[in-house]
């Protein structure tokens, strides 16, 4: 009796894997077909996630409007999208200079975006500015810059395209946020504050525009690349104890841009309102923040205290 089971089990595993693969391919194909002809705005399109999204939505037949701060990089992305594309199946992307650190230009940017096709079906707010430093070393000017890029910029752009979505009673606004929009860790005060603000804004927006058939989604992910957190001038990297360092490393253990881009596509097509894309440790930390905050606070504070003692030795 054991022999048939040993033979059948691998076959069942292979069949199950095959069915799972086919299912994923069908879902992926359907996801791409659902964005065909849709006007999609992607901010910071030249970043890793932005580029992956651009390729994914372009292959799906979306009418892309790509925003970024560097025109040469935007043109390079344009070339990579159109070089091997079938003009019968895809649309040439529109390029727009979009710099959230220049809030005075936002009104003109919104006008330029709307002039491309007259409307926006999907707005993907992907821009982000990161910083890792002790609170006392961060200037108020830096705080404002981070708030501009991470909060005021996305909210201003969302407000700009909102009237056309309301008039059409259709549209989707998606914020690519961070897990730190829901859970703050030491030495990232400005970044976490801006992400919390963005999370709150889009949560409010979701409730206010649902009656118009507009979907608002937020994706809270761990960092794409934890090695790119600039320190304040002259400040050494803060040290933490083992437990706090482990939690921080898990919170900043990034996902691949391609994985996040696929999650964005699925979120759009399934009209999910909130997605957490994180490893188990950040998820546990979120639960602790809600159900046992004193323990989480103690762990984070112990890490900070340990770093101070280490620097004094």
PLM feature segments, named:
Residues 178:
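Residue(s) in the substrate-gating loop at a strand-loop-helix junction
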Residues 134-135, 139-144:
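Substrate-binding pocket helix/loop in short-chain dehydrogenase/reductase
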Residues 84-104:
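Rossmann-fold cofactor-recognition segment
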Residues 207-280:
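SDR active-site lid
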Residues 39, 46-47:
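Conserved glycine-rich cofactor-binding loop
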């Amino acid at each position: 009796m054991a022999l048939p089971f040993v033979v059948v089990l691998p076959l069942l595993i292979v069949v199950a894997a095959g069915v799972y693969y086919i299912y994923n391919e069908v879902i992926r194909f359907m996801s791409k077909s659902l964005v065909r002809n849709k006007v999609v705005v992607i901010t910071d399109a030249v970043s890793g996630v932005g580029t992956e999204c651009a390729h994914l939505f372009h292959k799906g037949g979306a009418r892309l409007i790509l925003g970024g701060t560097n025109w040469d990089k935007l043109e390079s992305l344009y070339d990579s999208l159109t070089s091997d594309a079938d003009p019968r199946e895809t649309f040439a992307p529109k390029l727009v200079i979009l710099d959230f650190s220049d809030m005075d230009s936002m009104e003109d940017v919104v006008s330029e975006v709307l002039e491309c096709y007259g409307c926006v079906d999907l707005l993907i707010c992907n821009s982000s500015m990161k910083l890792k430093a002790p609170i006392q070393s961060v200037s108020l000017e830096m705080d404002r810059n981070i708030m501009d890029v991470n909060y005021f910029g996305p909210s201003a752009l969302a407000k700009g395209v909102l009237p056309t979505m309301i008039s059409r009673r259709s549209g989707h606004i998606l914020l690519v946020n961070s897990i730190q929009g829901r859970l703050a860790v030491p030495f990232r005060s400005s970044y976490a504050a801006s992400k919390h603000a963005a999370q709150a804004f889009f949560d409010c927006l979701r409730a206010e525009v649902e009656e118009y058939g507009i979907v608002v989604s937020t994706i809270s992910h761990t960092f794409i690349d934890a090695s790119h957190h600039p320190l304040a001038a002259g400040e050494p990297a803060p040290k933490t104890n083992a437990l706090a360092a482990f939690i921080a490393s898990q919170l900043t253990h990034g996902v691949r841009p391609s994985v996040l881009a696929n999650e964005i596509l699925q979120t759009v097509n399934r009209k999910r309102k909130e997605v957490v894309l994180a490893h188990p440790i950040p998820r546990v930390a979120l639960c602790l923040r809600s159900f046992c905050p004193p323990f989480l606070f103690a762990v984070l504070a112990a890490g900070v205290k340990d770093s101070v003692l280490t620097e004094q030795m």
